[in-house]
Every structure is written in C-alpha cells, then in structure tokens.
Amino acid sequence: PVAPDVRCVQSFTYTFTLERMADGQRHAIPMPKKYESYRDAQPYSLRIHTHGGEIYGEETGWLEYRMMERAPGTKGGLWSYRRLIASENFPGSSQYRNDISMINWPGNDYRDESIIDRSPLEQARALQDAKRVSLGFLHWMQTEAPRFGGTSGFPELRPRPDLFGTSDGLSKYPYIRE
C-alpha cells in the first residue's frame, strides 16, 4: 500500500450559472487577469478524463464533449450536464423562456493548491485565483470553445449573477470536495 499524502487534496470549484440566449446575442465578459496562463495550464477544454464508470458508466479514458450537442460516447453536451432549467419543460412561461445551466466542469476546477491548513492570507489568495480560473473558463466558453460546425465561442451565454446573489456571477463559496 502507498503511504497517505496529506498534500493530496481534491480541487475546488467556483461554479457559475448561465442563461442561453438567442444565437447572435453577445454577452461575453471581459478577459480576466491571467487568462492565457490559466487557459493553457488547466487547460480549458471540452475534453475530460474518465475513471472507469465515475461519469455515466463509461470506461477509463478520454471523452470529447461538445457544448450543446451530444458527442459520440457521451450522454449529452456540457450544457445539459448541470442544466437547472430546460425551457421546453415550461411552455408559455415568462419566467423560464431560456435554458439555465450551472457550470461545474474540470475547466473551472482550481487544482493549483489547497486552502486546507493554510494561513488566512494564503487562503484568500488561492480563493481569488480560483475565481479567476472560473471567470477564465466562462470567457473561454464565450469566445474560444469549439462550436459544432467549425466556428468558436458561445457569446450568447449570459451570466446570471442574480441567481447566486454575487456581482461576478460566481457562487458565494467554492464547492469543496474534501
């Protein structure tokens, strides 16, 4: 058996909610600080590594998702993975005219360091960096994510800060898996 490693902790995530507006609308957020370094290091992607049945029962390996459409070998797009509102379930509703999804994906996981057993100053810095990672993933989704058909970006995805009650649209607290 391998000895325990107290430094080996899971990533944590600031989730965010988006509303899918009509194609052609533009709601892209400004490029956040350190965007390029986080985009390349994460990397921001629709490709995820699976661990034999943890997600939908597939085998260990890599799965290439699409944003909105179902890709071969997947159960749906990233958008439907944590969709909160499917507007087709509310015909005629003025409150739920558009789909709303909460984004919790490897692209917005912060895995650079832990906030467990850190000083308050170190925790605050790591939490701020984690927010930048999530805002960077949102910016990537709106500007660079591959679209089925060969184009890039989904600028019609509108942040919904009102749903979490925060000015930046991120959850008030990170999702911590430990």
Describe each region flagged by the PLM:
Residues 1-178:
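Flavin (FAD/FMN)-binding glycine-rich loop and adjacent Rossmann-like elements that form
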